[in-house]
From Swiss-Prot:
It catalyses: L-lysyl-[protein] + O2 + H2O = (S)-2-amino-6-oxohexanoyl-[protein] + H2O2 + NH4(+); N(6)-acetyl-L-lysyl-[protein] + O2 + H2O = acetamide + (S)-2-amino-6-oxohexanoyl-[protein] + H2O2. Keywords: Copper, Cytoplasm, Disulfide bond, Glycoprotein, LTQ, Metal-binding, Nucleus, Oxidoreductase, Repeat, Secreted, Signal, TPQ. It comes from Mus musculus. Glycans are attached at N112, N267, N391, N482, N626. SMART domains: SR. The keyword Iron does not apply. Contains 1 lysine tyrosylquinone. Its EC number is 1.4.3.-, 1.4.3.13. Disulfide bonds join C71-C135, C84-C145, C115-C125, C202-C272, C215-C282, C249-C259, C333-C397, C346-C407, C377-C387, C447-C512, C460-C525, C493-C503, C555-C561, C607-C655, C639-C645, C667-C677, C714-C728. Its cofactor is Cu cation; lysine tyrosylquinone residue. This is Lysyl oxidase homolog 3.
């Protein structure tokens, strides 16, 4: 029996090579099933296309000696699970459609593929039959597998390439080597990595289009003119090693290897005769101009409010793409979403070209409108809105198809100034930071006082380890290392900083209430995170006033669900005026939302008949238009469970019988308007115009991919007898101008909502 043979694809630096991942299903050990057969013919599987990582790509199947693809009609995550196992991975994390990794060639072997997800082979799934398809290769399906191999499958790094030489990596080398150079490097000689090492590029025929592509690869939105007289003078004094010439880019390429270019032959003795090394100068985006303290370039910042943004990403320059239309933010459908459109987004935001064009809500799902679909960009557009697109209807797309991007970023070196020690894996440990000046650098610890989730978010981002799962104030349970000095305290971050040095902190005068290495800061990072959003329309639809007798509120009083004035009321006579509404809280992230406290510390509440896992999960507030709080919900504790879920998502959590608590990805927890404490006590509120505000996870106790969408606001008018609640929206769903109009709302003059 044949062993498994594997041709594995390259890491990102090589992504734009013409390479394929190929897997032969065999049996190198008893843990792998025998080679799968269809009739008398065996099947082989591989991943193809670019740009991609080794565990993702267009699925190709070899049957009867002929390679072919799979149509995306009726393709699901369950089918992706089966195919990823065929390819030697443990499971799928997503799938793609519309030839995201480029169209294949040859036969389309399978169409309308329908799997349960538990099949041992794709041959056990239903389909139209082998070779029976009405699709084109523009509908080729792809898979994103979990980067974890099945036991027994080889994990080779052999790369199958079409040409011997390819441009794998590009850098800028400053012409002047001495002195302390600030990062990122924005100007210098263009060098490409070839098998024999780094080589320069001949500047004969070099154009601004070439510079534009190089700058985009290196994380910069644009290029600028260079003082070539200076570089020509330097070139005469140095020896150069040229490896590349005749580069001709259109300017829309995401990588230099996609341009027309030629390599010098090994025996060529007249390399770049009469020419000089190519030099490029790039423009910093606004984020990095601020980071380096440089003055912002005019190119870097568009006038007026941005009309595109990224949400839900762990790092700068990645996230779900959202666009502004008619004062409201919405998402982009991933149909025909490609690297060209993604690069337009990245450059518009001040980054370089796109490293990945993400589909299938890889950065979590949005909520609300989907503004664009089938966006087709040439790559030259200054804004995504300049690209042709399709007017979308409700039937066209769902939020499970939200598009995302990962952009090329400038190299800043911030990840070299931080490290973790003592943890069980590279994703956790005690945080150590490097301080000092060159020649006198040392590593030190961070005081754990006030260290929390927001600070951990910045640390995990700086480390390149994704999202923060926990921010730890004590790390005594991890092995202590040689580093014992506390060099940073009082760290306060907003969560958006590029490094801990950008957060407010003490460095010269360390103040730490608890001394010793056991009370230093630590983190646990994660590749995925939850993302909670409140269904704002349901709040608006269900809000009403109830005058509830005091004799029915003893349990609520015990739970501290009433205003403080209730303590002096004439119990059990009288009543409290309550603003009731339903809260439907969705988890649209990529990880389950779990309470911070373990089961051992949950509290039993006799009145409600179940355990509460979080003391503070949501704040309910009534605010004046200027933001002054006049009433609050006092909802003391919560039980988290899956009330309902999206199609094909199963419930995992329930409060009954001391069950596990949480909210599964794709599910929501519903607090109905008629349950105890689902209200705000407005007995003491005077008639007027107010803002109803609901904030989920207000103390950042549990990590999420995005905290900016945790607040919901509504305009409301209370006349002493009735209340009108309208204009409810997630806090960041409106444009800046629409938010200003919301806050200036003058109130109602009649029952008519305007």
């Amino acid at each position: 029996m044949r062993a498994v043979s594997v041709w594995y694809c390259c890491p990102w630096g090589l992504l734009l090579l013409h390479c394929l991942c190929s897997f032969s299903v065999g049996s190198p050990s008893p843990s792998i099933s025998p080679e799968k057969k269809v009739g008398s013919q065996g099947l082989r599987f591989r991943l193809a296309g670019f740009p991609r990582k080794p565990y993702e790509g267009r699925v190709e199947i070899q049957r009867a000696g002929e390679w072919g693809t799979i149509c995306d009609d009726d393709f699901t995550l369950q089918a992706a699970h089966v195919l990823c196992r065929e390819l030697g991975f443990t499971e799928a994390t997503g799938w793609t459609h519309s030839a995201k990794y480029g169209p294949g060639t040859g036969r389309i072997w399978l169409d309308n593929l329908s799997c349960r997800g538990t099949e041992g082979s794709v041959t056990e799934c239903a389909s139209r039959g082998w070779g029976n398809s009405d699709c084109t290769h523009d509908e080729d399906a792809g898979v994103i597998c979990k980067d974890q191999r099945l036991p027994g499958f080889s994990d080779s790094n052999v790369i199958e390439v079409e040409h011997q030489l390819q441009v794998e990596e590009v850098r800028l080398r400053p012409a002047v080597e001495w002195g302390r150079r600030p990062l990122p490097v924005t100007e210098g000689l263009v060098e490409v990595r070839l098998p024999e090492g780094w080589s320069q590029v001949c500047d004969k025929g070099w154009s601004a289009h070439n510079s534009h592509v190089v700058c985009g690869m290196l994380g910069f939105p644009g290029e600028k003119r260079v003082n070539m007289a200076f570089y020509r003078m330097l070139a005469q004094k140095k020896q150069h090693s040229f490896g590349l010439h005749s580069v001709a880019c259109v300017g829309t390429e995401a990588h230099l290897s996609l341009c027309s270019l030629e390599f010098y032959r090994a025996n060529d003795t007249t390399r770049c005769s009469g020419g000089n090394p190519a030099v490029v100068s790039c423009v910093l985006g606004p984020l990095y101009a601020t980071f380096t303290g440089q003055k912002k370039q005019q190119h870097s910042k568009p006038q007026g409010e941005a009309r595109v943004r990224l949400k839900g990403g762990a790092h700068q320059g990645e996230g779900r793409v959202e666009v502004l239309k008619a004062g409201t933010w919405g998402t982009v459908c991933d149909r025909k979403w490609d690297l060209q459109a993604a690069s337009v987004v990245c450059r518009e935001l001040g980054f370089g070209t796109a490293r990945e064009a993400l589909s299938g809500a890889r950065m979590g799902q949005g909520m609300g409108a989907i503004h664009l679909s089938e966006v087709r960009c040439s790559g030259q557009e200054p804004s995504l809105w300049r690209c042709p697109s399709k007017n979308i209807t409700a039937e066209d797309c769902s939020h499970s198809q939200d598009a995302g991007v990962r952009c090329n970023l400038p190299y800043t070196g911030v990840e070299t100034k931080i490290r973790l020690s003592g943890g069980r894996s590279r994703y956790e440990g005690r945080v150590e930071v490097q301080i000092g000046i060159p020649g006198h650098l040392r590593w030190g610890l961070i005081c754990g006082d006030d260290w929390g989730t927001l600070e951990a978010m910045v640390a995990c981002r700086q480390l390149g380890l994704g999202y923060a799962n926990h921010g730890l104030q004590e790390t005594w349970y991890w092995d202590s290392g040689n580093v014992t000095e506390v060099v940073m305290s009082g760290v306060r971050c907003t969560g958006s900083e590029l490094s801990l040095n950008q957060c407010a902190h003490h460095s010269s005068h360390i103040t730490c209430k608890k001394t010793g290495t056991r009370f230093t800061a630590g983190v646990i990072c994660s590749e995925t995170a939850s993302d909670l959003l409140l269904h704002s329309a349901l709040v608006q639809e269900t809000a009403y006033i109830e005058d509830r007798p005091l004799h029915m509120l003893y349990c609520a009083a015990e739970e501290n669900c009433l205003a403080s004035s209730a303590r002096s009321a004439n119990w059990p006579y009288g009543h409290r005026r309550l603003l009731r509404f339903s809260s439907q809280i969705h988890n649209l992230g990529r990880a389950d939302f779990r309470p911070k406290a373990g089961r051992h510390s949950w509290v039993w509440h006799e009145c409600h008949g179940h355990y509460h896992s979080m003391d503070i999960f949501t704040h309910y507030d009534i605010l004046t238009p200027n933001g002054t709080k006049v009433a609050e919900g006092h909802k003391a504790s919560f039980c988290l469970e899956d009330t309902e879920c999206q199609e094909d998502v199963s419930k995992r959590y329930e409060c009954a019988n001391f069950g596990e608590q949480g909210i599964t990805v794709g599910c929501w927890d519903l607090y109905r308007h008629d349950i105890d404490c689902q209200w705000i006590d407005i007995t003491d509120v005077k008639p007027g115009n107010y803002i109803l505000q609901v904030v989920i996870n207000p103390n950042f106790e549990v990590a999420e991919s995005d905290f900016t969408n945790n607040a919901m606001k509504c305009n409301c008018k209370y006349d002493g007898h009735r209340i009108w609640v309208h204009n409810c929206h997630i806090g960041d769903a409106f444009s800046e101008e629409a938010n200003r109009r919301f806050e200036r709302y003058p109130g109602q003059t009649s029952n008519q909502i305007v």
